[in-house]
Amino acid sequence: SSNGNIGTPTAFDQTLLPVSAGVYQIVKQYGTNGTAGAAGYPYRVIHKPVSGSVKVGIGSTEIRTADWSVVTTTGRITLAANIGHAITGISKASSAVVTLGAHTYVTGMSVGFKSVLGMTQINGLRGLITSYDATTITVNINSSAFSVYTSGGETNTAPQTGETVSCGFEFDWPVRFN
């Protein structure tokens, strides 16, 4: 597996290689910090992950399978199209309530925050939506000690600048029999 060869895969085992906007290649890292490992290369491209074994994360949040797809003959992962909404309010609470106006988010989606004024501590964070209604979402971010929200900001499902996209998976070792 991607988790130490025999461990259960997690969404954070291996950093994905960007191919194009929203498209990533699965790789197995060897060595440390980009140096060659025992295989002689810093990573190996994985073309055929075991179907049903792939998990994907953005930052430190595992994202639901409905928000990405994998081609098990190429090892390419495609993230769903970005969904973004302007923020009009954020509560100070153990689970932040974010006011957006009409939106298309649902429970389980992962959203990142940027460009918020006042409550700047939330910028760059990512949380899972735990509940929603027509104009708000509740995320698993404790904002109770943050500054008061004043204005602006947006939420996005796509990775924010600086966020790592990672995955875990099982794969078969290539073997040749003579």
Please place each PLM-identified region on the residue numbering.
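Extended beta-strand solenoid/passenger and fiber regions
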Residues: 2-73, 78-83, 106, 170-178
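Small/polar beta-strand repeat architecture
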Residues: 62-67, 80-178
